[in-house]
Amino acid sequence: MYTTYQNLYKQLTNIYPLNEAKAIVRMVLEDRFGLTLADIYTDKVTQLSADDASKLEKIMLRLAKGEPVQYVLGSVTFCGRQFGVAPGVLIPRPETELLCEWVVNVLDKPYCALQPPTPLRVLDVGAGSGCIAITLSLDMPNTVVSACDISPEALLIARDNAIRLGAAVNFQLKDALQLAATEETFDIIVSNPPYICDSERTEMMQNVLDHEPPTALFVPDDDPLRFYRAIAEYGTTALSHGGELYFEINDRFADEISAMLNALGYAGTEVRTDQFGKQRFVKTMRA
């Protein structure tokens, strides 16, 4: 197969905007075939071995069908680390990195190693690939982190990621809508639950609809806050007094979510925007 960088990205322009198509091809050539940016722009792709050229052709066929490049490569970069992903688990987004950064910046305080404080107990509801739980475990060493998800497939991937990255996270199979009260309490509960309304499907890219798990993305139009309500209600007993709850949210419902949290007795509710200026995150505290 003789091809050029230009020929490769043109195969994807019916699915992606031009710049995104170029970025996807660069990602493949760098990650899978070890080409540098200079190699790509000087069309060293034309010098691939017959075996590598065959592998590239198969990759391009998958990409041309709309399969996300993260699934094709089997990994995604999140907070500077490589997380394994596969069909059946949501691909982590850059916005969620900002959620992790907020938690870490607020709660990771210096301490004397000879007299460490009691570890913070953290729960991630809706673990997916484990990106939030693993990041918090690694970036906030004085923590005991648990995470739950309803998907056995996602938990297998999350556990593999934790082992490979050296994170101690207790993963459990649980339904976020049916979290039962226990004697265990947490200092932090964090969640990026499904929050896209069914009616918003028409605004989504087709390859997301075709390939990513809908149960990790969508909520019914008549109850868009169902996950926030369930987790917040659980937090009224599962959070320690003064413990904090962090959500990634649909920007359409920032006011409604804040009002719901206040009605449940939470205090100090704060909303933050993402890199696009959308109201994307909420932090609140159990009084």
Residues of each region from the PLM?
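Residue-level signal for pocket-adjacent positions within structured domains
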Residues: L35, D43, E67-P68, L73, ...
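N-terminal auxiliary segments of SAM/dcSAM-dependent transferases
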Residues: M1-L73
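SAM-dependent Rossmann-like transferase core, predominantly class I methyltransferases
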Residues: K44, S54-P141, V145-I157, K283
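Short, low-complexity, intrinsically disordered N-terminal peptides in bacterial proteins
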Residues: M1-K10, K109-T118, A287
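Alpha-helical elements of Rossmann-like donor-binding domains used by nucleotide-donor carbohydrate transfer enzymes
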Residues: N7, M27, K55-K58, L98, ...
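Short, solvent-exposed loop/helix junctions and linker helices
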Residues: Y2, I15, S49-A53, L90-R93, ...
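S-adenosylmethionine
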Residues: D139-V144, C148-R286
